């Protein structure tokens, strides 16, 4: 409720599964002109809330082309709110320029390494720091992007989706990968097309990385912040593992890596020196 009102949102797009929650908070969101449910007419919820729209009905009959207006590169592009801070969430406003620069940086080989040959599955939601930039990087690179929906917490469903869509790269928090690996371990199933996973949000256990090794999957540990669009560092040491002995490589691969292009890092001690 706070974010909707603070951002002065006029239209809110939502998954049908969130409708029970929306019915509770809608009366408190007085600035919202319309609630757009991302579904077809037959799956629309029955509700007494006014100004509810069906996404597919809104699209029906509309032109298939769109003439984009001229936009200054420094104009506002997107607004994303932090969630892990104390106090109220804080909005971070991105310009078109910063978003494009971040997109180029995330596509680089030592970052997420996204190209037109990839099928990308961002398990991290778009409200979690812009799905780590994947919704921007995929169309720029020409990669196929698979939208997982909201039922990706269990290993069997995730493994099935990876195999059905031929996913080559995926991004998510450690819990997601723990669930996937537990399923693969117990079922004997494999994810043959998966080449790399990007892990962030919290520290990735070495055991997860080493188990992914047995499936031929490169694990990349990354770090970022909402204020950084969000990617700040990426660890691509897996491509250079032949340069290290086993113990050294284990220590190196668990850190969050090096700053990506455009990021400046200042390291200080407890005395700010």
PLM region spans:
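Short beta-strand->loop structural element characteristic of the AMP-binding/adenylate-forming
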Residues: 1-24, 90-93, 122, 144-151, ...
């Amino acid at each position: 409720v706070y974010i909707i009102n603070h951002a002065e949102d006029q239209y809110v797009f939502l998954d049908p599964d969130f409708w029970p929650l929306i019915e509770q908070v809608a009366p408190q969101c007085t600035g919202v002109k319309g609630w757009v449910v991302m579904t077809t007419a037959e799956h629309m919820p029955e509700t007494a809330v006014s100004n509810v729209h069906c996404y597919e009905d809104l699209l029906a009959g509309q032109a298939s082309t769109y003439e984009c207006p001229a936009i200054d590169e420094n104009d506002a592009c997107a607004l994303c709110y932090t969630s892990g801070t104390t106090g109220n969430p804080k909005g971070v406003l991105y310009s078109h320029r910063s978003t494009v620069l971040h997109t180029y940086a995330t596509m680089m080989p030592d970052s997420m390494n996204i190209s037109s040959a990839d099928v990308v599955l961002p398990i991290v939601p778009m409200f979690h720091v812009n799905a780590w930039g994947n919704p921007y990087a995929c169309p720029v690179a020409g990669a196929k992007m698979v939208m997982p929906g909201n039922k990706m917490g269990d290993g069997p469903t995730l493994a099935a989706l990876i195999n059905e869509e031929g996913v080559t790269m995926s991004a998510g928090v450690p819990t997601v990968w723990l669930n996937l690996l537990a399923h693969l371990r117990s079922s004997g199933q494999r994810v043959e097309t998966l080449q790399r996973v990007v892990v962030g949000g919290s520290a990735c256990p070495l055991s997860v990385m080493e188990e992914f090794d047995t499936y031929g999957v490169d694990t990349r540990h990354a770090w970022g912040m909402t204020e950084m669009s969000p990617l700040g560092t990426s660890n691509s040491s897996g491509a250079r593992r032949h340069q290290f002995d086993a113990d050294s490589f284990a220590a190196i691969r668990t850190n969050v890596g090096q700053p990506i292009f455009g990021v400046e890092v200042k390291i200080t001690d407890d005395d700010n020196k």
